Amino acid sequence: MNAEDVKGFFASRESLDMEQYLVRDYYLECVGDIETALAHFCSEQSTAQWKRVGVDEDFRPMHAAKVIDYDVIEELEQLSYPVKHSETGKIHACRVTIAHPHCNFGPKIPNLLTAVCGEGTYFTPGVPVVKLMDIHFPDIYLADFEGPKFGIDGLRNILNAHGRPIFFGVVKPNIGLSPEEFSEIAYQSWLGGLDIAKDDEMLADVTWSSIEERAAHLGKARRKAEAETGEPKIYLANITDEVDSLMEKHDIAVRNGANALLINALPVGLSAVRMLSNYTQVPLIGHFPFIASFSRMEKYGIRSKVMTKLQRLAGLDVVIMPGFGDRMMTPEEEVVENVIECTKPMGRIKPCLPVPGGSDSALTLGTVWRKVGSVDFGFVPGRGVFGHPMGPRAGAKSIRQAWEAIEQGISIETWAETHPELQAMIDQSALKKQ
């Protein structure tokens, strides 16, 4: 690529109609001449060849991805990761902002991903280390997406739960219970105060606990719990499956008593999520399997908040994500970023409920609330409810009691003096530390 060719892949914001472009932020490590490497990077993901031989034309003004800003962070002695490459020369770490014309792929998530994090992005000469840090969508692009059907307000209205977090619980043991056993445990947790009892992301439609039988038992238990507590409840059924089975599993689960559905968003694909969101009449909740495999490396892959944003775009009403606990191995800053992506303005797209989770209990509720910075989040203990020494009903009560302490502005230790379920969790934690 000569110097004139390189210029065709650079532009200023002022020279572009930015409503016609997605803006992407990347961390890149470039080998050799930086601007040549960046031009190749834009070319490979858009106009790899911008004219026909012997024809006086240039498709770059309309169709090329273009660098609109870049900053050289530092010169490196070697690449951050031993990625195989053939280029030679100095290595520079760069922050790069690229405008990509969305007419190249339209409002279609598979085509969008192919352009911004596909072959062209990760196989560009001179750019062996790549991390997609963010995507910014213009309102004209967002207008073609439906987004969450219910969102935060819709879910709160279903549950009549306002001014506080939404309390989920992952029924445990997560694998191995019969539908009858599973439903009894969920029922007890609803009586104790959970809003939503959910299948684990690994429990879907299996021979020993079919979605049909499990949903029937849980639907009956849910209605019984609603009658006894006077509170709406949700059974969240996992319908993750092959794409050609999703509609059938949806119908079976809802017909038999599930009133919200769990989907492992990346394993089934965001296009499948969008299809389900457009079809369903119950809230759709996403879980995070597969994302860490390409988001955890600091300088390579895709930053997790990009996937959170895309899950919201695809129509998830709730996004479950790695939370603040040490077990989740996620920096606090990254968790907060993901929470913000669920709720910040996004054109016509409704906010979705963020659920940062991982090894939570009544003892961590206050910490999660303070770090999230609002009540618009879901709290999703597993063993913190179902491993409670007094049983799942008491485990759920301990969560509600911890929230009462927060509302009263007093410590959970003080509140626990008159609330034995909360005291039992404190005592159990103290024993584990011995």
UniProtKB/Swiss-Prot annotation:
The UniProt record lists the keyword S-adenosyl-L-methionine: no
N6-carboxylysine found at: 198
UniProt entry tagged with the keyword Membrane: no
Keywords, in A-Z order: Magnesium, Metal-binding
Annotated positions binding Mg(2+): 198, 200-201
Cofactor(s) listed in the protein's UniProt record: Mg(2+)
GO terms for MF: magnesium ion binding; ribulose-bisphosphate carboxylase activity
InterPro entries with a match to the protein in the record: RuBisCO, RuBisCO_lsu_C, RuBisCO_lsu_C_sf, RuBisCO_lsu_fd_N, RuBisCO_lsu_N_sf
GO term, biological process aspect, one: carbon fixation
TM segment ranges: none
Comment on bound cofactor: Binds 1 Mg(2+) ion per subunit.
Similarity section: Belongs to the RuBisCO large chain family. Type IV subfamily.
Subunit text: Homodimer.
Function: May be involved in sulfur metabolism and oxidative stress response. Does not show RuBisCO activity.
Protein's UniProt name: Ribulose bisphosphate carboxylase-like protein
